[in-house]
């Protein structure tokens, strides 16, 4: 435990991650803005490693519920403790994570979540010896994928007679929310496994429904008697890039080719709108991952989620 002011944190973080930040074109001001955005107004607890004269490592715990903590903040620092490159990354990471375990146990938290980020590397290179040696278990791998639409050859699309395709605005937000809840509560995504109904509802709110209404590729699928079977939400990222924030199929109709049909129609509409790149995020163990890969999407980044539960913190 310890204290540190934001200016010291920014300077140290930029120093410790300078090659990485320079490669990404990230400057000191962006580091400051990023840390301020993630820290200000949030209940955070810092784990600090110091010598007598200077900061040599830090990590932060972010409470995400009354019983759950998340180690570190987000993509800016890649989900790992920030360590002075002159010191052993392995040793200091392990010390900081152990401090987090003890603090969590003393404050009655039941679960700690750790993230390990990777960019453009094989997952096998990114196993976290430190997390696993402290009793954490890998929960799932979430990946970001992208497809270069300039190289994509649109297939002939065959729409079954009983299926109709419409724009997102042709379904009510209430009906979309209800389908989202059913699809992911009953589906093969690990992320939603332990979420409460309220947390799933909040997640739907984060998907950008209102913005998706304006984009080509935000569509719905209806079946017999007009039953809502699936929908997609697409968001604008840059002038020539779009992002699939959500794509789901009713659980009764999964595995019947509707996901493939939806993706084909989405991509056709987006390409016709002059868009050059399409991105998305998914769990690597989901069936949808193989569908995306078969249509030219490739992994560009990812994160391994680790979890420690059940009062094991004070060992």
Feature annotation, model-predicted:
Residues 1-13, 164-180, 187:
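A short beta-loop-alpha structural element at the N-terminal edge
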Residues 14-34, 185-206:
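Conserved GNAT-fold acetyl-CoA-binding loop/helix
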Residues 20-21, 25, 29-106, 117, ...:
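Conserved donor-binding loop and adjoining core beta-sheet/short helix segment
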Residues 36-41, 208-215:
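Short loop/turn motifs at secondary-structure junctions and domain boundaries
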Residues 84-102, 249, 255-268, 272, ...:
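Conserved acetyl-CoA-binding loop-helix of GNAT-fold acetyltransferases
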Residues 85-162, 304-308:
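Acyl-donor-binding surface of acyltransferase catalytic domains
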Residues 112-116, 244, 278-282:
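Conserved hydrophobic beta-strand within the GNAT/NAT acetyltransferase core sheet
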Residues 128-154, 264-268, 272-315:
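Active-site/acyl-donor-binding loops of N-acyltransferases
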């Amino acid at each position: 435990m310890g204290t540190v002011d934001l200016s010291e944190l920014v300077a140290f973080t930029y120093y410790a991650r300078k090659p990485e930040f320079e490669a990404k074109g990230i400057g000191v001001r962006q580091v400051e803005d990023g840390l301020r955005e993630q820290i200000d107004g949030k209940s955070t607890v810092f784990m600090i490693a110091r010598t007598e004269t200077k900061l040599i490592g830090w990590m932060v715990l972010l409470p995400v519920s009354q019983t759950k903590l998340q180690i570190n903040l987000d993509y800016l620092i890649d989900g790992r403790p920030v360590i002075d490159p002159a010191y052993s990354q392995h040793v200091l990471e392990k010390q900081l994570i152990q401090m987090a375990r003890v603090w969590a146990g003393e404050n009655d938290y039941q679960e700690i979540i750790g993230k390990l980020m990777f960019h453009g590397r094989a997952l096998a290179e990114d196993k976290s010896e430190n997390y696993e040696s402290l009793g954490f278990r890998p929960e799932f791998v979430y990946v970001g994928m992208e497809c270069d639409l300039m190289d994509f050859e649109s297939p002939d699309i065959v729409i079954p007679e009983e299926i109709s395709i419409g724009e997102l605005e042709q379904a009510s937000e209430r009906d979309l929310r209800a389908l989202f809840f059913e699809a992911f509560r009953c589906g093969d995504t690990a992320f939603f496994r332990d979420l409460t109904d309220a947390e799933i509802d909040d997640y739907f709110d984060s998907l950008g429904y209102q913005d998706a209404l304006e984009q080509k590729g935000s569509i719905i699928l209806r079946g017999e008697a007009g039953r809502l079977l699936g929908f997609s939400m697409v968001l604008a990222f840059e002038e020539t890039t779009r992002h699939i924030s959500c794509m789901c199929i009713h659980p009764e109709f999964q595995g019947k080719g509707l996901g493939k049909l939806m993706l084909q129609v989405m991509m056709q509409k987006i390409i016709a709108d002059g868009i050059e790149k399409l991105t998305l995020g998914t769990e690597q163990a989901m069936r949808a991952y193989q569908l995306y890969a078969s249509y030219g999407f490739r992994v560009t980044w990812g994160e391994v989620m680790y979890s420690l539960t059940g009062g094991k913190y004070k060992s």
